[in-house]
């Protein structure tokens, strides 16, 4: 991920973040229905605000000039956020997507992006899931239906360097 982020920033390509909501006590108090994935994340405190699980690694923190969309609550970085508006304001139609988790958030964001008319490329080695089976399902079965390309970080960096040369 760091190589792709560095190459995009060096090339002047706008970097966007679509982060998961960092949970706080009381977030689900008045919700009638909570998706199983949200219940699991809440019980594990996967994205708990102010905790280790709610922080980015320092090398992946947004930098000045990066754009951070509203946090999403379930899976898609587009659902109930301003990501689509932020991208359209910049005239962006092609997206390079990477991040976690391949079979949930990444896949849902890729699907939603395709539905909205974006050309989506996924960075194969800049994502992860909980198992090999989930990675296979995401990268070999589901995401190819929506992403224009699934490339390695090295291929992405090479393509960026060729396009700006």
Residue map of PLM features:
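Short catalytic helix/loop segments, enriched in acidic residues and glycine
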Residues: 1-2
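Active-site-adjacent betaalpha module
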Residues: 6-11, 28-29, 33-165
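Catalytic-core segment of enzymes that process non-peptidic bonds
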Residues: 17-27, 32-33
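RNA substrate-binding interface of SAM-dependent RNA methyltransferases
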Residues: 12-16
């Amino acid at each position: 991920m760091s190589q792709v982020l560095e190459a995009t920033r060096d090339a002047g390509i706008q970097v966007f973040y679509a982060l998961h909501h960092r949970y706080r006590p009381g977030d689900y108090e008045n919700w009638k229905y909570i998706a199983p994935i949200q219940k699991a994340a809440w019980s594990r405190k996967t994205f708990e605000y102010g905790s280790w699980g709610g922080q980015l690694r320092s090398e992946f923190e947004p930098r000045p000039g990066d754009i951070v969309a509203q946090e999403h609550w379930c899976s898609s970085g587009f659902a109930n956020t301003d990501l689509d508006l932020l991208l359209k304001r910049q005239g962006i139609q092609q997206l390079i997507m990477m991040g976690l988790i391949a079979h949930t958030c990444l896949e849902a964001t890729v699907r939603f992006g395709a539905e909205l008319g974006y050309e989506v490329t996924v960075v194969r080695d800049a994502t992860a899931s909980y198992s090999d089976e989930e990675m296979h399902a995401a990268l070999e079965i589901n995401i190819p239906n929506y992403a224009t390309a699934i490339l390695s970080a090295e291929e992405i960096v090479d393509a960026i360097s060729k396009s700006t040369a």
